[in-house]
């Protein structure tokens, strides 16, 4: 295990700007409402236009959302917050308290795939079992990785092994590959994803409180407020890839709380949903093959807007953003659709935890365009994507849904 301590004096935790309130007693998410007209949500100021590739249409049009629904598949989960596929047709859903459950053939299996509630600290709204990633060769090596906060509130990125039973992991197989001290109970990030290069990417928030009081996001000697990139195959517990820009685990920086990131299955482009502070939520984007070292601006900027001032040159603005004045509070990054409905091909779907709104983002001949498509009743904690490219919605109150065409 590698552990990077933060030798910082703790202050009293005050996070009215930063901590998203979550329901304390979960109930089943109601079935979503999908009859909202496609009202465009403006982005101001307009981010720098990026030349389009692989667009669903040259005009940048969206499907009529009234012809689609988010179909409830299972309910009764305990505060689910992530969904991943292992390539077998099964879906794996994280419960914040420290369990991973299996969805198979449309049913939620009773037994947990993994139960590590004995080592997960989940008392804080942004703490718990937060991320899951299956190794690209999972079918051969049975390895998967999780990101959780431990009983001390610190981040643990750990590797586990499946048992001889494919529906049961071995909780005693844990190898902690990276531990990071957390100065506060919020902004833990939590996402894990394997990139097209085979490396493991991890999103970490800026350490919490409010306003990044220790300047972590802009400090390339500290892992907080970053996207990390680890080679988990070449050494134990991992190696730092030779082309990481700062000679350490950091790949990109200047992020507040990158709760969910994903790579487009077709183009390998990277999308980042970075949770904002008091005013703006943002989606960041990088072309496939982009080098490391991108500075996304926090806390000089919140979204594309000045926050602390004195911003240096070379910051990368988001390609989409929305204001809290529209009712939102916390962006949940999603996925680019690559499933069986061609009219959705190439559209990146993302949402907001508080409003339940779901937007589409596409690259057209005019650059990036976004539009609010669905008004749901779901506190959106995550999206998921299976091996066929279909997209799922995960709700804090216990439901999992799939985007489907109304017959």
Model-derived regions, located:
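Loop-centered beta-sheet repeat module
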Residues: 222-230, 240-266
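Beta-propeller blade signature
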Residues: 157-165, 216-232, 286-287
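Surface-exposed loop and turn segments in beta-propeller and other repeat-based domains
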Residues: 111-125, 172-189, 232-251, 296-326
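Acidic/polar, solvent-exposed loop segments in beta-strand-rich repeat domains
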Residues: 210-222, 239, 291
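Conserved blade-ending motifs and adjacent loop-strand segments that build the rim/top face
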Residues: 367-387
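Sec-dependent N-terminal signal peptides
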Residues: 1-22
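Ser/Thr-rich, Proline-interspersed low-complexity disordered segments
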Residues: 15-65
């Amino acid at each position: 295990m590698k552990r990077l301590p933060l030798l910082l004096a703790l202050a009293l935790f005050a996070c009215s700007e930063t901590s998203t309130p979550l329901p304390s007693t979960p109930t089943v998410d109601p079935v979503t409402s999908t009859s909202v007209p496609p009202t465009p949500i403006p982005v101001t100021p307009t981010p720098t236009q990026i030349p389009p590739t692989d667009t669903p249409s040259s005009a940048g049009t969206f499907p009529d959302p009234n012809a689609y629904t988010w179909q409830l598949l299972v309910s009764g989960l305990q505060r689910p917050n992530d969904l991943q596929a292992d390539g077998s047709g099964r879906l794996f859903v994280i419960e914040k308290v420290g369990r991973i459950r299996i969805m198979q053939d449309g049913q939620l299996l009773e037994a947990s795939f993994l139960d590590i509630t004995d080592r997960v600290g989940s008392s804080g709204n942004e703490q718990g079992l937060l991320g899951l990633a299956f190794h690209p060769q999972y079918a051969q090596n049975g390895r998967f990785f999780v990101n959780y906060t431990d009983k001390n509130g610190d981040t643990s990125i750990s590797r586990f092994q499946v048992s001889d039973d494919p529906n049961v992991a071995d909780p005693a197989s844990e190898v902690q590959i990276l531990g990071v001290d957390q100065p506060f109970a919020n902004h833990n990030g939590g996402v894990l994803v394997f990139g097209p290069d085979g490396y493991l990417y991890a999103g970490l928030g800026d350490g919490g409180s409010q306003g990044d009081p220790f300047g972590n996001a802009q400090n390339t000697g500290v892992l907080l407020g970053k996207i990390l990139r680890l080679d988990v195959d070449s050494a134990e517990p991992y190696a730092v890839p030779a082309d990481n820009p700062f000679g350490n685990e950091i790949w990109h920086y200047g992020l507040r709380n990158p709760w969910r990131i994903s790579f487009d299955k077709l183009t390998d482009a990277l999308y980042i949903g970075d949770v904002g502070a008091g005013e703006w939520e943002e989606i960041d984007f990088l072309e496939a093959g982009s080098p490391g070292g991108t500075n996304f601006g926090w806390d000089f900027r919140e979204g594309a807007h000045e926050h602390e001032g004195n911003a240096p040159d070379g910051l990368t603005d988001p390609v989409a953003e929305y204001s809290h004045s529209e009712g939102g509070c916390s962006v949940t990054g999603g996925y680019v659709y690559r499933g069986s409905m061609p009219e959705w091909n190439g559209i990146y779907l993302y949402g907001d935890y508080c409003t339940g709104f779901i937007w589409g983002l596409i690259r057209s001949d005019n650059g990036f365009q976004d539009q609010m498509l669905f008004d749901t009743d779901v506190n959106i904690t995550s999206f998921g994507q299976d091996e066929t490219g279909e997209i799922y919605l995960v709700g804090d109150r216990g439901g999992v849904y799939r985007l489907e065409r109304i017959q």
